[in-house]
């Protein structure tokens, strides 16, 4: 994840340089960031994307956002097609469609003069020189907008042929799936861009059925995120409360073998080894891996889900 994040930031830095804008990196938590902003830019407006985070980040970001919202100094952009307030099941599909069909902002063309005072922050180059990746994972995905658009176009034009069937295969999914999940998660391409490009591609496609299947997955992507947005307690509690006490504390030795892909079950172990090597595995196999840990190995999901 850190590697992909650095890939994305590197491309952002390069693109901003072309517009005469340097990318600076702040290091610290949200409280420290708020204090730094108020000292250096007390009248500034904050622009950020909404994200559905785990509890640790959600708590801190909510305090940060509330501070600036009270002063009407924050603009939050919708990242995915989810309801962030006024939750209404009946209106969900309508709201999703409304968000996904909004016009895509055009790229800023003009160079911006850099007239800010010395803000004493590291440039991206200075920041990245301090980052050391212990496990390079050479076969993992490359982050950044350029790669995201390459994947999207190759999927819509060629790789998506047979997607409806191949996406379930641990052998074929690596190439037949869009492989855009990483880029959607890190923001190197927007869901709105993917959806609108998909709508443009469908009429002239020779594999419409596969693209319609992909269209459903874009809805499901937000459907599952909506669950965590609406019920953040699902991070800690089972959806069905009666299941919370079914398992004990877990067996660390069994969990360790599961993580390493050394359970002795060939299919499961092969998937775990693939995941460790590539940093990605298709949705059906992710579901299988977690189901195996919960049902076959009878381990608590609270311990296996973060791993």
Question: Where are the predicted features?
Answer:
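Active-site "lid/cap" and pocket-lining segments within catalytic core domains
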Residues: 1-214, 225
């Amino acid at each position: 994840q850190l590697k992909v994040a650095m890939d994305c930031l590197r491309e952002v830095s390069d693109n901003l340089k072309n517009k005469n804008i340097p990318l600076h990196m702040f290091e610290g938590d949200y409280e420290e960031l708020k204090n730094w902003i108020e000292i250096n830019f007390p009248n500034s407006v904050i622009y950020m994307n909404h994200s559905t985070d785990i509890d640790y980040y959600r708590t801190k970001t909510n305090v940060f956002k509330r501070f600036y919202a009270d002063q009407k100094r924050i603009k939050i952009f919708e990242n995915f097609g989810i309801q962030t307030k006024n939750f209404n099941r009946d209106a969900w599909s309508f709201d999703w469609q409304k968000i996904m069909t909004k016009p895509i902002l055009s790229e800023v063309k003009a160079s911006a003069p850099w007239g800010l005072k010395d803000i004493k922050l590291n440039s991206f180059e200075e920041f990245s020189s301090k980052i050391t990746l212990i496990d390079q994972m050479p076969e993992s995905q490359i982050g950044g907008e350029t790669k995201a658009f390459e994947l999207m176009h190759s999927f819509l034009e060629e790789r998506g042929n047979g997607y409806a069937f191949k996406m379930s295969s641990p052998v074929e999914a690596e190439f037949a799936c869009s492989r855009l999940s990483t880029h959607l998660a890190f923001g190197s391409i927007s869901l709105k861009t993917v959806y609108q490009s998909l709508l443009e591609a469908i009429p002239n496609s020779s594999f419409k059925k596969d693209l319609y299947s992909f269209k459903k997955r874009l809805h499901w992507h937000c459907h599952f995120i909506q669950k965590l947005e609406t019920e953040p307690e699902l991070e800690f509690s089972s959806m069905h409360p009666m299941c919370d006490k079914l398992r004990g504390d877990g067996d660390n030795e069994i969990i360790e073998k599961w993580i390493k892909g050394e359970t002795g079950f060939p299919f499961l172990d092969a998937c775990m080894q693939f995941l460790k090597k590539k940093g990605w595995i298709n949705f059906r196999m992710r579901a299988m891996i977690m189901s195996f840990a919960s049902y076959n190995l009878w381990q608590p999901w609270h311990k296996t889900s973060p791993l």
